[in-house]
Amino acid sequence: MIQVQTRLRVGDNSGAKELMCIKVLGGSMRRYASIGDIIVASVKEATPGGVVKKGDVVKAVVVRTKKEIKRKDGTYIRFSENAAVVIKDDRSPRGTRIFGPVARELRDKDFMKIISLAPEVI
């Protein structure tokens, strides 16, 4: 569960290291985002020479959450950190590599490019 002011690690090589959620997209009073949801975030920490800089406002898709999510078969999945991938307006990733595992739920939300770049899909 990601809400406003939540800090997330970045799971790609776009140049950002840490993001802070400033808005959860999808409804006027929507409070929480989970895996596969799009957020608007501010870059709080970035690497020099990256595509995005500190202070940039970007869109990102949540790929890992510490809060478990229930699957249709009754199993739960959770990760050790909150992480997101910076995306463009056409929902494709800004970076060219994805780091760490991502959840299978991204396939249902049509983030196929992220799924194909990820080293592990859980």
Swiss-Prot record:
Keywords noted in UniProt: Ribonucleoprotein, Ribosomal protein, RNA-binding, rRNA-binding
Q: Which residues form the signal peptide?
A: none
One GO cellular component term of this record is: cytosolic large ribosomal subunit
A single GO molecular function term of this UniProt record:
large ribosomal subunit rRNA binding
Q: Name one GO biological process term.
A: translation
Pfam families cross-referenced by the UniProt entry:
Ribosomal_L14
Q: What is the role of the protein in this entry? A: Binds to 23S rRNA. Forms part of two intersubunit bridges in the 70S ribosome.
**HAMAP family noted in UniProt:** Ribosomal_uL14
Q: How does it assemble?
A: Part of the 50S ribosomal subunit. Forms a cluster with proteins L3 and L19. In the 70S ribosome, L14 and L19 interact and together make contacts with the 16S rRNA in bridges B5 and B8.
Family assignment?
Answer: Belongs to the universal ribosomal protein uL14 family.
The record's listing under PANTHER family reads: 50S/60S RIBOSOMAL PROTEIN L14/L23, LARGE RIBOSOMAL SUBUNIT PROTEIN UL14M
Name it.
Answer: Large ribosomal subunit protein uL14
Lineage from the top down? Bacteria, Bacillati, Bacillota, Clostridia, Eubacteriales
